[in-house]
UniProtKB/Swiss-Prot annotation:
It comes from Aspergillus kawachii (strain NBRC 4308) (White koji mold). This is Probable endopolygalacturonase II. The active site is at 201 (proton donor), 223. One of its GO terms (biological process) is cell wall organization. Keywords: Cell wall biogenesis/degradation, Disulfide bond, Glycoprotein, Glycosidase, Hydrolase, Repeat, Secreted, Signal, Zymogen. The lineage of its organism: Eukaryota, Fungi, Dikarya, Ascomycota, Pezizomycotina.
Length: 362
């Protein structure tokens, strides 16, 4: 028979065990109000709510190495103190991560503090969000305003970004530049669904990767839907890309593929489908193989092949001083193209097109 003392001791020990367990259980669902607390406590949480965090200057909101299956919720207004640095402002990695924005939330980067019209030159500006190694994961419903520079840098496998709003409209008059919305590289399986973007650079830029789908996009004020520049990276392959059911307005270009002069690589299995453009200032459709130091040279090379490219139902208007279609390929490097219902009007016809497949028109 147990003595009263031994039962009491057992009860106290059990209570101590429960007491020590309780904080761990409480951390299963965590609300953080500072970047430091989020970084320190993230590994112990299955659900992380980021409530109105003010991120200190020169600091990344560090959500890398999240436990598999973690849910992340942005709530309230997230802000960032000012410092000239490379960023990123937010970085996230892990597997099976679900990221959402609560109703009424805003991630306000207040990019005008950095904007000087010089983009990657001039002041050092932080990139916004690194989704590097954020595999088999999703980001849904984020509302983002005025990124200092590029918004999303995606280097992940099997990631889906849905209903993302990137509103850098203020940059049109306040010096926003190089504010790419989605830069994709070294990724297999990227889905970008129904984004709304107003920016001052590419709405989408794919530098390398495979199995990429972009659909339902609204792209305003930037440089259009781009593949490239391809070349001179560790990975110079872009394969199996579908860009469809999207509008591009008041932008420099609508549809663009560009490769680096003298580089090697490949661009293949590319489809642009049901793209509607308006108010395009430079080129409606542009495919060129002559980029060097970020600028076209007019002298295409053939080291990066562009094959199996399909344009279907690519329509709309460009400005009177713009060029409807410009195709500048290296010798033998552009082949196996399909064009169906490509109707771009309003601008000039180019006399400088070269080496493009006969099914295309220039």
């Amino acid at each position: 028979m147990h003595s009263f003392a031994s039962l009491l001791a057992y009860g106290l020990a059990a209570g101590a065990t429960l007491a020590s367990a309780s904080p761990i259980e409480a951390r299963d669902s965590c609300t953080f109000t500072t970047a430091a607390a989020a970084k320190a406590g993230k590994a112990k949480c299955s659900t992380i709510t980021l409530d109105s965090i003010k991120v200190p200057a020169g600091t990344t909101l560090d959500l890398t190495g999240l436990t598999s299956g973690t849910k992340v919720i942005f709530e309230g207004t997230t802000t960032f103190d000012y410092e000239e640095w490379a960023g990123p402002l937010i970085s996230m990695s892990g597997k099976d991560i679900t990221v959402t924005g609560a109703s009424g939330h805003l991630i306000n980067c207040d990019g005008s503090r950095w904007w000087d019209g010089k983009g990657t030159s001039g002041k050092k500006k932080p990139k916004f969000f690194y989704a590097h190694g954020l595999d088999s994961s999703s980001i849904t419903g984020l509302n983002i305003k005025n990124t200092p520079l590029m918004a999303f840098s995606v280097e992940s496998d099997d990631i889906t970004l849905t209903d993302i709003t990137i509103n850098n409209a203020d940059g049109d008059s306040l010096g926003g530049h190089n504010t790419d919305a989605f830069d994709v590289g070294n990724s297999v399986g990227v889905n970008i669904i129904k984004p709304w973007v107003h920016n001052q650079d590419d709405c989408l830029a794919i530098n390398s990767g495979e199995n990429i789908w972009f659909t339902g996009g609204t792209c305003i004020g930037g440089h259009g839907l781009s593949i490239g520049s391809v070349g001179d990276r560790s990975n110079n392959v872009v394969k199996n890309v579908t860009i469809e059911h999207s509008t591009v307005s008041n932008s420099e270009n609508a549809v663009r593929i560009k490769t680096i002069s003298g580089a090697t690589g490949s661009v293949s299995e590319i489809t642009y489908s049901n793209i509607v453009m308006s108010g395009i200032s430079d080129y409606g459709v542009v495919i060129q193989q002559d980029y060097e130091d970020g600028k076209p040279t007019g002298k295409p090379t053939n080291g990066v092949t562009i094959t199996d490219v399909k344009l279907e139902s690519v329509t709309g208007t460009v400005d009177s001083k713009a060029t409807d279609i410009y195709l500048l390929c290296g010798s033998g490097s552009c082949s196996d193209w399909t064009w169906d219902d490509v109707k771009v009007t309003g601008g000039k016809k180019s006399s400088a097109c070269k080496n493009y497949p006969s099914v295309a028109s220039c």
